[in-house]
């Protein structure tokens, strides 16, 4: 190993440890590593002549000039605006009526409604799953459809878009990884969304089957935070014309991102134009605009890119990839290879709660291994990225932790539902990735 490889490994380990042990707030560990890259480049730069680009400020903070990062950042502003429309209120109203009816058919209908909501807000929307949990705990107990049969499946359904029109975050991560890996191939957003649909289909299939494995008992009592989340969107609605402009801005931004290969640079700034319009017509104030433009997830995404670049440019990713490829040999079927990396990525993401950071670590390795074995790496690039949002089998962070606590599940009850779900989702994900991107 060269000195550059060793220092790249130091940066990577430092980031993982900071994320794993919550040393710094979410989004900051990669930024700290960007600073570390500059320090290491200044101290050891002369001893790393093999690097084509020095580890300076422009290199360490290149994520903040990345096209995809800015497209994603602007789209976060649009998402904040769309959540102020009556769309979410309508979802709440429909869910409340279905819970009153009760029964298995209502359960399936609730899954579909929540997954349609996720189609708009995208995978991993904290505000959406908090809203879903808040709605479930505030519903009166009913033997027809007890809250314990809703908490886990509906919470996880908020992470699975039925019609994946908003895959901006995950797509942006995948595109950034491909760029840092030096691959000239591009991923059309439509094909990426199709693989996402396979993942959602796997969840839906298990959610329907797993209904009978869920316990029947009351859930936790609602807290003040639950009440606030539930009625947050029930204040005065915005004028009809503002709501119409907001919805148009959302649709136009989605279409622009889908047509990135056709529109080129314009597709990256159209969400920015739409975001500025939201500020001009006062759908959002400046603080809301700023907080979403530079949200922790954006800082995380921008900060992880230089770390991934270090691994690729130093040759460490290729070295590890070739070593793994040699170790496993050419007899490993592509599907099994995909499954191994999706299990690794999803497990680390499940335990750390850092989907973007973990995806940025494992996806380049999966790409390098596929290249070493002569496989098309596109399926790995998409499947491994999406697998970071497909853990949920441990009640450690965020969504699964809230579902476990608020649903009053025992660990046996929790695992009885989540572990088979985990396996089924990854099988569907890997199969879908190989169908859309043959290896």
List each model region and its residues.
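Alpha-helical transmembrane segments and their helix-entry boundary regions
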Residues: 26-30, 69, 107, 126, ...
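Transmembrane alpha-helix interface/packing and boundary motifs in multi-pass membrane proteins
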Residues: 15-24, 114-123, 155-165, 256-262, ...
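Transmembrane helix-bundle signature of multi-pass membrane transporters/permeases
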Residues: 77, 112-116, 131-135, 152-163, ...
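Alpha-helix N-cap/start motif
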Residues: 57, 147, 189, 286, ...
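Membrane-embedded alpha-helical segments and adjacent helix-loop junctions characteristic
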Residues: 46-145, 292-373
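Re-entrant/interfacial helical elements at transmembrane boundaries that shape
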Residues: 92, 125-140, 151-155, 165-182, ...
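Juxtamembrane and boundary regions of transmembrane helices in multi-pass small-molecule transporters
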Residues: 7, 143-152, 159-236, 386-439
């Amino acid at each position: 190993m060269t000195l550059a490889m060793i220092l790249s490994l130091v940066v990577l380990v430092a980031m993982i440890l900071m994320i794993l042990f919550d040393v710094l707030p979410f989004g900051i560990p990669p930024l700290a590593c960007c600073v570390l890259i500059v320090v290491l480049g200044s101290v050891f730069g002369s001893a790393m002549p093999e690097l084509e680009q020095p580890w300076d400020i422009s290199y360490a903070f290149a994520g903040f000039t990345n096209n995809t990062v800015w497209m994603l950042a602007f789209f976060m502003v649009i998402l904040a605006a769309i959540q102020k429309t009556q769309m979410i209120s309508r979802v709440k109203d429909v869910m409340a009526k279905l819970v009153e009816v009760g029964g298995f058919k209502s359960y399936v209908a609730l899954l579909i409604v929540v997954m349609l909501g996720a189609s708009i807000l995208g995978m991993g929307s904290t505000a959406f799953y908090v809203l879903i949990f808040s709605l479930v705990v505030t519903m009166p107990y009913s033997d027809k459809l007890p809250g314990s049969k809703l908490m886990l499946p509906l919470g996880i359904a908020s992470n699975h878009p039925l019609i994946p029109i908003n895959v901006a975050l995950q797509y942006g991560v995948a595109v950034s990884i491909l760029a840092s890996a030096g691959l000239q191939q591009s991923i059309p957003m439509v094909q990426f969304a199709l693989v996402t649909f396979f993942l959602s289909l796997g969840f839906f299939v298990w959610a329907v089957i797993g209904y009978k494995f869920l316990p029947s008992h009351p859930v936790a009592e609602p807290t003040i935070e639950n009440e606030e989340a539930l009625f947050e969107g029930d204040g005065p609605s915005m004028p009809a014309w503002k709501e119409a402009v907001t919805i148009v801005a959302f649709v136009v931004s989605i279409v622009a991102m889908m047509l990135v290969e056709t529109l080129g640079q314009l597709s990256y700034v159209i969400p920015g134009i739409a975001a500025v319009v939201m500020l001009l017509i006062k759908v959002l104030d400046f603080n809301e605009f700023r907080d979403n433009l530079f949200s922790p997830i954006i800082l995380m995404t921008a900060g992880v890119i230089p770390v991934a670049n270090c691994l690729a440019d130093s040759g460490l990713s290729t070295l590890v990839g070739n070593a793994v490829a040699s170790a496993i040999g050419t007899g490993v079927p592509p599907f099994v290879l995909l499954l191994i990396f999706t299990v690794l990525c999803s497990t680390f993401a499940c335990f750390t709660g850092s989907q973007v950071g973990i995806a940025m670590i494992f996806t380049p390795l999966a790409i390098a291994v596929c290249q070493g074995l002569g496989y098309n790496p596109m399926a790995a690039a998409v499947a491994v990225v999406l697998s970071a949002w497909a853990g949920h089998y441990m009640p450690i962070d965020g969504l699964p932790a809230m579902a476990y606590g608020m649903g009053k599940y025992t660990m046996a009850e929790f695992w009885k539902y989540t572990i088979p779900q985990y396996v089924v989702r990854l099988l569907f994900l890997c199969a879908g990735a190989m169908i859309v991107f043959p290896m």
